[in-house]
Amino acid sequence: GGTVEIGEGEYLMRDSLHLRSNVTVRGVQGKTLLRKAPSAVSALAIDGDFGEEQITVVDPAGFAPGCGVAIWDRNAGGFHTTVARIIGQNGNTFAIDKPLMADCMVQNEAKAATVFPIVSGYDIEGARVENLVIEGNKQANVPLNGCRGACIFLYRAFGTVIIGCVARNYNGDGIGFQQSNDVVVEDCVSEDNAVLGFHPGSGSQQPTVRRCVARRNGSDGLFLCWRVRHGLFEDNLLESNGQYGISIGHKDSDNLFRRNTSRLNKQSGLFFRNETLGMAPHRNRFEDNTSENNGGAEIRIRGEVNDLTFVKNMIRDTREEPSVGILIEEHVGPVHLENNAIETKQQIEDERTADHN
């Protein structure tokens, strides 16, 4: 337990700030800045084998013990990408502190780069992060996928609390947590990241995201990945993102969304991904949300999803172009609509046949 306080200033990060169980890391609001160092990147000189704890690179410049490193090839994306710390060097061969998660083959364009989450927590519980500004320096870094990285990234980090942080300009996601139950994210801003603003995923149960802002991210503001269930998402602002304001899909059931505002996103303010019956995001409830001036239908419901509830939401488009409030596609099951205010050129476009209503 205990608290680590980080004073005012800018800190250049060559590896993650690694969270520990039941420890609070606290910065000074708006004045403690963690900046990602520019990345080095090299092709592998020889194959990295699954389970191996070293890599050999063509160009060792910029790689050194103590640096964070990611290793992948074109078949080893997602969770098959390895993120580790370099712990030793012999010429252009580097020892790492974790085994490789996949074969990374030279013939498949295997690479290593000094990219990593700037703040990370793995296999912990009860950690807390407060009042950090995290600068991803995306112009000087190669991408790291959201299954393994973000400005703040958690993996099996149960009960972690993130409060008052800014996550910006990362070449990937802003704040992401995977297989991490009972995570709370409050009063945070995720902006100008290359991909997602907030990314709860991979079976993260009972998340809470409250009073947060996601803006100008390259893809979605809030992306519920796979099996995000029994979550609470309230009083958030999702604006001017490059794809959807909110995206929900694979087995993301039984969540409550209330008093969120989704506006000026390139595509729909709320999007249900196209999932078959067993994998669809059933029984989600939306109360007192606002969706306005987004691209496409304000709310687009796809797939074989059942038992969605929309109560007292404001859905509007104040522009001159044709607009649709709610688009319900042909395979969607029951949708309950109650006391919603829909101010679009076409309020509801329902493509279902009688047997799907």
Residue locations for each model-derived region?
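Short, basic/aromatic beta-hairpin or loop at an interaction surface
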Residues: S39-F50
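Parallel beta-helix/beta-solenoid
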Residues: D49-G77, S120-N141, Y155-R168
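Glycine- and charge-enriched low-complexity intrinsically disordered segments
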Residues: A102-E130
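Generic beta-strand structural signal
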Residues: L19, F50, G88-G91
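N-terminal extracellular ligand-recognition/capping segment immediately after the signal peptide
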Residues: G2-T24, V28-A40, I71-A84, K98-N108, ...
